[in-house]
Amino acid sequence: MSSMDQVIKKENKGRTSTVGKYSVLIMIVGIVFIAANLRAPLTSVGPMVGFIKDDINISNTMAGMITTLPLLSFALFSPIVPKLGQKYGVELIILGSIVFLTVGIAIRSLSGVASLYIGTAILGLAISVGNVLLPGLIKREFPKRIGLMTGVYSISMNLFGAIASGVSVPIALGWRFGWKGALGIWGVLSFISIFFWLLQMKHSNVRRDTVHKEKADSHVNLWSSALAWQVTLFMGLQSMFFYVLVAWLPEILKQQGLNSSQSGLMLSVMLLALLPFTFIVPVIAGRMSGQRSLVTITAILFLIGTFGLLYGSSNLIIFWIIALGIGGGFAFSLSMMFFGLRTRNAQQAAELSGMAQSVGYLLAAIGPTLFGFIHD
């Protein structure tokens, strides 16, 4: 029996007779499609930075803001998202977010500097909803399979993120869509995802008594919790590191002699290298009483990749890129796992997710713009 079959069988126990294996499968498919939209609209930007700068005549600092704006949106909106999910329902808020994501991607692809930044801000707000609510949704729907389901949605998120960075240049140049088409094409994915999420909502089996009980039991001041701040700091550091790489790795590699297609491909290699670990690490972490050893491995991988890329042999670029990718897989997976492992219920998981992503992405937002300023 496959891992996914085990999830469906295990989580199907205890559900009403009208909701069975099909409803669990639809929930999994819905989560996979939502997760697929959480990185692709962002990772597609990195290989296009040079084209955008040349087309609309902006500085490196302003180009860095294209990546920074979504992070600021994450930081500002994340604390509000759990409250919206609690008041109106997680599924409905996620539906609204994917609609706004489609609109934001479309606006970003229009002509002009203003539309570029307005659309980017809108899609950032939309993505923050999925970022915050998915960990809590997984804890609610799959409490006995948090590690496995975290791996499933992490794989989807990072796979499509890798694809987006790798195909941006071919779409822009090979298909002659330009940078606007290369960024705008991801609106098709978000539009399709709306229908899959609607199908999931139709078969949703949310028990209101359980939801109300969680509301009553989840009044914990996370902002005064040392553990919550540890999770937040870890989230912020890994996010800052990741988004600096997404925004500027292609430009760094071009300065080392790679062309646009090759540098975009290297970004894809990094994102693909982390894929298996975004699945493996949550499963392993979920079976461990503590995760400090995994955090240590993460730090070592980041150090090897960073110093190798900056000071190591250019002949070993692929090795440094893979080390960074594996480290990113460890870091991201652990961040998402901590939201579920360090809380009692789905609402607390959403609130910790909101706190960590708010403060964490505020730290992360400094990275791309600061790097662009130094680069100028």
Predicted regions mapped to residue ranges:
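Juxtamembrane intracellular "pre-TM" segments in multi-pass secondary transporters
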Residues: 9-21, 202-231
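Helix-to-loop junctions at the C-terminal end of transmembrane segments
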Residues: 77-89, 277-290, 375
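Conserved MFS/SLC helix-loop-helix module at the cytosolic interface between two early adjacent transmembrane helices
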Residues: 76-114
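Extracytoplasmic gate region of multi-pass secondary transporters
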Residues: 45-46, 224-268, 273-278
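A late C-terminal transmembrane helix in Major Facilitator Superfamily
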Residues: 343-376
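Cytoplasmic helix-loop-helix junction between adjacent transmembrane helices
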Residues: 119-155
